[in-house]
Amino acid sequence: MSNRIKVGILISGNGTNLQAIIDASQKDSFPAEIAIVISNNPSAYGLKRATSADIPTKVIDHKLFDQREDFDTAVSLELRKADCELICLAGFMRILSEQFVNNWPMRIINIHPSLLPSFKGRNVQKQAIDAEVRIAGCTVHFVISELDAGPIIAQAAVPVLKQDTPASLSARILQQENHIYPLALELIAKKIQGKPINARKTNTSDAEEKLISLY
């Protein structure tokens, strides 16, 4: 497909969501191509996944930077060099600075392992189990300066079972992440091909209206 949106993917670890996007992007009809994969972790297995797919990679070790803003500037520079139009966070374990987010307005998407706006931050599977909810899931959303609060793109739900541990629930949610992230990327890539995207902070009604159950 011509005129594909160029996407930069930021990772820190295994890269299962990266692999899902790689697989989807190999289809001719997919509206996005991965221009570069950047990791702050030199040992991230996701780098091998990208290399195996002939995708350019770059390691930018955050430990080499005294200031978070300097690290973010280095990442942004590589994304600009690769002509990226959209950024996907796929297991990227760094909080981006407000300056970085503002430099890429409505051009950064993330996947979070809960049904936002519920259970923000870390250890969300434990939060869900402790709250005794019956449904958990994952959310693809735009990144804004406020953590886990950007406009929702899509969600997938899974049941929380009585015998669930944080690990078992996390594994089941991850399967849905692998399904929903490429779908959300496809949607956004099509939308930004000459069409503006309006920012809007999430609320409960947004989450309910855009719930996609893939379980």
State the predicted function of each range.
Residues 32-74:
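Short, surface-exposed acidic-centric catalytic microdomains
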Residues 35, 85, 106:
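Conserved acidic residues
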